[in-house]
Amino acid sequence: STNFNLMFFNCDALVDPDFSAWDVSNVTDFSFMFSGCALLNTDSMANWDTSNGTNFSSMFTSCPSFNGDLSGFDFSSTTSLFSIFNGCTNFNRDISMWDVSGITNFGNLFTSCSRFNQPIGVWDISSATRINGIFNSATDFNKPLPWNTSLVTNMSSTLRSMTSFNQDISSWDINQVSNFNLFMYSTTISTANYDALLIAWDAQGAMAYSGTVSFGTSQYTSGGAAEAARTSLIAKWGGITDGGAA
């Protein structure tokens, strides 16, 4: 079969299967394959040839035990990694070597991955248009993210509820972003990082977004360039919610 959609959906009996001999080189649809497999945890997919896979959406959604080796996965035939690890609360494997340069949709990729903290700042996400919810409730994540976001239009809940996150994302290009809903809601970055963000983002000029942008409870330095940039951004967008002046 070339379609593995829902193959083991909600299969509680799947714990440590040996998939090492499986030839998946012709499979195109892996969507929801292991979704809801609460006890699944295996390294036996490490050598799978996924190069023909076009749909990986929610492949491991709601697999709270899963922490398997997927370092060899090939995404050259797909443009979406939507929700693959959503709810994988135990997942924390190094996938920094993945080639994601052709991926446009990273939506909800690590949502509720509360242990995940791997160096994926090296990823080339220059094709991305959606990174909405990618780190929503990824409570342990705190790695640099010097990403090229120049094509991104949706940053809704991108850095939401990240209790450990404190990085400088001032280099992010946000000109095309039309959805900033709950962007950094319930997240706090340092005043230095927030100041840098405000100044750099305001300098990007005109914005596509109209509405309020949440920076959680992050605080800015009053009476200087950061406050001036914040005032300017409020005029461009319509509003900012944050922790006020430091």
Where are these regions (language model features)?
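Negatively charged
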Residues: S1-A246
